[in-house]
Design a protein with these regions (language model features):
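Glycine-rich phosphate/adenosyl-contacting loop at the front of the ribokinase-like
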Residues: 2-87, 325-329
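Active-site metal-binding loops of divalent metal-dependent hydrolases
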Residues: 23, 147, 177, 269
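Conserved phosphate/ATP/ADP-binding segment of small-molecule kinases
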Residues: 169, 179-250
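Short, conserved phosphate/pyrophosphate- and ester-handling motifs at nucleotide-, phospho-/glycolipid
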Residues: 56, 205, 267
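Conserved N-terminal subdomain of the carbohydrate kinase-like
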Residues: 62-147, 171, 315-329
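A generic structural signal for short hydrophobic patches within well-formed alpha-helices
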Residues: 122, 131, 149, 180, ...
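Hydrophobic faces of well-ordered beta-strands that scaffold small-molecule active sites
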Residues: 65, 173-175, 202
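Conserved phosphate-binding/catalytic region of the ribokinase-like
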Residues: 1-18, 217-329
């Protein structure tokens, strides 16, 4: 197995990952019914960074979520849900003047459509001052995504400060490109490349890399040439495979075969699984496998956060040979 060559320094009491970003209340028809046909809506929460924090907690990695919520019933629901998943939410601040963001899902066989109501939300008012939080200063890893800089000018400044301003002693950083075209007036090609180049660990889908930076990025190795600076770059190729580049070395692990219920949240789950492997000193191959099996748990449910396999099954999946892995459903 190929080692990852680099990983964040671990203090005596172990790693702590702090995930920074917006989480909204999510409304969706139950059982995948189209919005126009449903008689009711189920309420859940949705946020890329809090998804990562919750899955890290599932993997017994200490995690914190840092954000802002409105002083409203939706904000209290979000806080309760994430806290109940085992995530430290003590750094979340309440804004009495701004609401908690909201999204509505409309299931469709061609792909779930999502409508966002987040303009002027409490989280959109976050800025670089968030980085002074003790929850961040005492963490060993910060995780952000490309969603945050799309929310507002101050959130863009937050992302730039977190990833690009690197004074001595700053925690390691993880960045999921997570390009959402609907959040941008035009593709933020240079901004997201700048943020990715500045991070220690980067996640990007091959398809989103092509959408952002051109069809010339045909393979994972092309993306590595375009993003040479991250210590670890993970390129995901959907249902095919994921490749981790660690310095000049690389390792590829095929995706698990999954009967997909809904793809939303799978990328966050993969990132959390891989980071859990990294922080637990697993090899590149085992970290990728942990990413895949965590993503599979999200793909099998309608929400963003699904249950992991039992610990014994996880160990079996990490230990089986590549043929057995490829045959697993």
């Amino acid at each position: 197995m190929t080692d990852l060559l680099w990983r964040p320094a671990a203090p005596a009491d172990g790693h702590v990952a702090a995930c920074v970003g917006e989480t909204m209340v999510a409304l969706a028809p139950p059982d995948g019914i189209a919005l126009r046909q449903t008689a009711g809506l189920a309420l859940d929460v949705a946020g890329a960074e809090s998804n990562v924090a919750m899955y890290l907690a599932d993997h017994e990695v200490r995690s914190r979520w840092v954000s802002r919520l409105g002083d409203d019933v939706f904000g209290r629901r979000v806080l309760h849900r994430i806290s109940a998943a085992g995530v430290d939410v003590t750094a979340v601040r309440t804004d009495p003047d701004r609401p908690t963001g909201l999204l509505v899902k409309d299931p469709d066989p061609a792909g779930t459509r999502v409508s966002y109501y987040r303009r002027g939300s409490a989280a959109s008012a976050m800025g670089p001052d968030v980085l002074s939080s003790p929850a961040l200063r005492t963490a060993t890893l910060w995780h952000l995504t490309g969603i945050t800089p799309a929310l507002s000018d101050s959130c863009r400044e937050l992302a730039m400060a977190a990833l690009c301003d690197r004074p001595a002693g700053r925690p390691a950083t993880s960045f999921d490109v997570n390009y959402r075209p609907s959040l941008w007036r035009e593709p933020p090609r240079e901004l997201l490349r700048t943020l990715a180049q500045a991070a220690d660990v980067v996640f990007v889908g091959l398809d989103e890399a092509q959408s952002l930076w051109g069809d010339g990025l045909r393979e994972a190795t092309d993306v590595r040439e375009y993003l040479p600076d991250p210590r670890i770059l993970v390129v995901k190729d959907g249902a095919t495979a994921a490749t981790a580049f660690c310095g000049d070395a690389s390792v590829t692990v095929p995706s698990l075969k999954v009967d997909v219920v809904e793809p939303v949240g799978a990328g966050d789950a993969f990132a959390a699984g891989f980071l859990a492997g990294l922080l637990k000193d697993q090899s590149a191959e085992r970290s990728l496998r942990t990413g895949h099996l965590t993503a599979a748990s999200a793909l099998r449910v309608t929400g963003d956060h699904g249950p992991l396999p039992e610990p014994g099954e996880r160990r079996r999946l990490l230990d089986i040979d590549i043929r057995g892995w490829c045959e697993t459903r």
